[in-house]
């Protein structure tokens, strides 16, 4: 789980995206919380990001789906964390309409620090090319109304993109976007 503060902004904020990227680089360079292997950490110069762009900051319509049943989310390993679909986001990007599902980790939601945290995994047409093949994640807070800001500039790779010892949630097929999201972290290395 990404440890930098999640955002709850309603307008594009270049500084917020820059802070997120800087925090990722600081975390990954450090010994304590880095998902990198020791060899990669010793040679780490910083993550490769797409250029920050206001184009990839969208205000989505939020619809709560409160009748969803908890389920075990598939991961890259044997672990099966229990999630619940929390809601749906609909938005327009480059003149096309899209929908993404938001999820809540049941165990994490019981902890004070994460009681209002939601998980937004997605894949797109850059996945496997310029970005990690398994998709990327954005951490968000439960919205207070019927809209939510999505800043794709703050998208990050799952830990398993850097180190195979991690077990990461696999992006559900419903969250595969038929568009290039040229924002956030690029793939680490081949």
PLM region spans:
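Mid-length scaffold segments of soluble, non-membrane domains
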Residues: 66-133
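Start-of-domain marker
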Residues: 10-58, 63-67
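Bacterial Sec-dependent N-terminal signal peptides
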Residues: 1-12
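Extended, aromatic/histidine-rich regions of cofactor-dependent oxidoreductases associated
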Residues: 14, 156-190
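Short acidic/polar mixed-charge low-complexity motifs
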Residues: 54, 94-98, 146
